[in-house]
Amino acid sequence: MKLHELKPAQGSRKTRNRVGRGSSSGNGKTAGRGQKGQKARSGGNIRSGFEGGQTPLFRRLPKRGFTNINAKEYALVNLDQLNVFEDGAEVTPVVLVETGIVKAEKSGIKILGNGELTKKLTVKAAKFSKSAEAAIIAKGGSIEVI
């Protein structure tokens, strides 16, 4: 047997059903689209949420809220994530991005107090939660708001 003689196993492949190719095929004339109407036409489809002309739900409900264009989004780092650094190390936003703890700086870094810190560190970030601040200082480390 050679490569060009290989064939799939009998019955493992089903031939594609070609519609609209004569009435004797069983799928000629209307090609499985029924009779006339929007869905029988080319490009004829109804958008999602269409309710047959009735005012759709998304238009019956009131608009609500807005997006504040001045909102700052901080990259969040928990205390237990800082344990990867050596004792006495200086942790800056640049170092956090390089080590892969944070993907991007965004509007700055905020240190949160989740988890337990086991090392003395000097942490520089834009914001600190009160619990994170207390935990870093309790371990003999220092914080610096940048």
UniProtKB/Swiss-Prot annotation:
One Pfam family in the UniProt entry: Ribosomal_L27A
GO molecular function annotation: rRNA binding; structural constituent of ribosome
UniProt keyword list: Ribonucleoprotein, Ribosomal protein, RNA-binding, rRNA-binding
Compositional bias annotation for Gly residues: 23-35
GO cellular component, one term: cytosolic large ribosomal subunit
Region (Disordered): 1-57
GO biological process: translation
Coiled-coil parts of chain: none
Function: Binds to the 23S rRNA.
PANTHER family cross-referenced by the UniProt entry: 50S RIBOSOMAL PROTEIN L15 (PTHR12934), LARGE RIBOSOMAL SUBUNIT PROTEIN UL15M (PTHR12934:SF11)
Protein family: Belongs to the universal ribosomal protein uL15 family.
Subunit organization: Part of the 50S ribosomal subunit.
Protein name, per record: Large ribosomal subunit protein uL15
Lineage, broadest ranks: Bacteria, Bacillati, Bacillota, Bacilli, Lactobacillales
Gene designation per UniProt: rplO
